[in-house]
């Protein structure tokens, strides 16, 4: 029995459904952070994700944000008639990748307007080499933060997140949560979902300890046939100066050579976050496009 509903029916996105399409997600070339096992499953409640199988080559997803319903697809292009059906209940089509856009130009000629760049949701791409060395004048300040951490906290250890250490990651997450003004608008619940997942050892992860005290952690997964590491979560205690910079640096160093890029996800239009992400000098972006209902 298929764990995914058949179009026009949709079903809530379950762990079994995401597991059944995990291989398909890993084959996507653009490395878009939302189109990964972790992002779909961990944020399924936040976005109220639903899934449907249009045919053997195409999957459909529905979601909600800020009171508006959206859809996105994976696989072969949909008939225009089906897209119009989706727009009857959705405000926009999101997560259109650059490759989908270039490979389906004929499809988009059926609309009054072309898809537009969704800049607030561009994923930031950095080379593994850049983040694992922090060499060069542009990243000199970042390297100083790392060196400062090493000088201040020489008695540190790094471990993987597993059944024994994930309780320590939860402690860091809860301390981080106390510093958030609007916790329900953050990725706190999604991070809890991640740490509760029995298969957490299937992910790339690190947890940082100073004198046995857990101070930072990160969780990521491979995408784009193993060439991109998508960092879903990075949390640290701000009272341990340089812990954010060090976990970032140490994680990049821990990655296998097959990883070319590290995707540190989007800034969501937050100017402070944008400045922070730009300060690490991205190599480029995993661009995303959207098409609003008015383009019909």
Predicted regions located by residue number:
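Short Lys/Arg-enriched alpha/beta "domain-start" segment
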Residues: 6-35
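Conserved donor-binding loop and adjoining core beta-sheet/short helix segment
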Residues: 23, 29, 33-103, 209-238
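A conserved short alpha-helix in the GNAT/GCN5 acetyltransferase fold that borders
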Residues: 83-88, 149, 248-256
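Short catalytic-loop micro-motif centered on adjacent basic/acidic residues
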Residues: 94, 159, 261-264
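Conserved active-site alpha-helix within GNAT-family acetyltransferase domains
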Residues: 102-116, 144, 268-285
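Acyltransferase donor/substrate-recognition loop-hinge adjacent to the catalytic core
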Residues: 110-182
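A mid-sequence, solvent-exposed acidic-amphipathic segment
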Residues: 163, 167-230
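Aromatic (often tryptophan-rich) hydrophobic motifs at membrane interfaces
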Residues: 205-294
């Amino acid at each position: 029995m298929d764990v995914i509903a058949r179009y026009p029916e949709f079903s809530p996105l379950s762990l079994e459904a995401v597991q059944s399409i995990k291989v398909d997600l890993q084959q996507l070339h653009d490395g878009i952070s939302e189109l990964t096992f972790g992002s779909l499953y961990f944020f399924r409640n936040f976005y109220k994700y639903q899934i449907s199988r249009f045919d053997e080559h195409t999957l459909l997803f529905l979601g909600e944000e800020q009171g508006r319903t959206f859809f996105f697809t994976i696989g072969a292009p949909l008939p225009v008639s089906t897209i119009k059906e989706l727009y009857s209940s959705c405000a926009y089509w999101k997560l259109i990748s650059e490759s989908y856009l270039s490979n389906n130009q004929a499809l988009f000629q059926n609309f009054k307007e072309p898809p537009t760049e969704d800049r607030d949701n561009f994923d930031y791409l950095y080379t593994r080499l850049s983040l694992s060395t922090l060499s060069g004048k542009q990243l000199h300040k970042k390297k100083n933060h790392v060196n400062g951490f090493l000088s201040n906290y020489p008695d540190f250890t790094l471990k993987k997140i597993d059944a024994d250490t994930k309780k320590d990651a939860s402690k860091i997450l809860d301390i981080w949560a106390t510093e958030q003004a609007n916790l329900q608008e953050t990725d706190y619940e999604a991070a809890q979902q991640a740490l509760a997942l029995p298969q957490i050892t299937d992910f790339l992860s690190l947890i940082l300890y100073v004198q046995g005290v857990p101070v930072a952690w990160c969780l990521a997964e491979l995408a784009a046939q193993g060439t991109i590491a998508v960092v879903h979560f990075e949390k640290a205690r701000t009272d341990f100066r340089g812990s954010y910079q060090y976990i970032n640096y140490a994680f990049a160093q821990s990655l296998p050579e097959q990883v070319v890029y590290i995707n540190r996800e989007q800034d969501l239009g937050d100017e402070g976050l944008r400045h922070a992400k730009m300060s690490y000098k991205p190599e480029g972006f995993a661009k995303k496009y959207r098409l609003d209902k008015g383009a019909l």
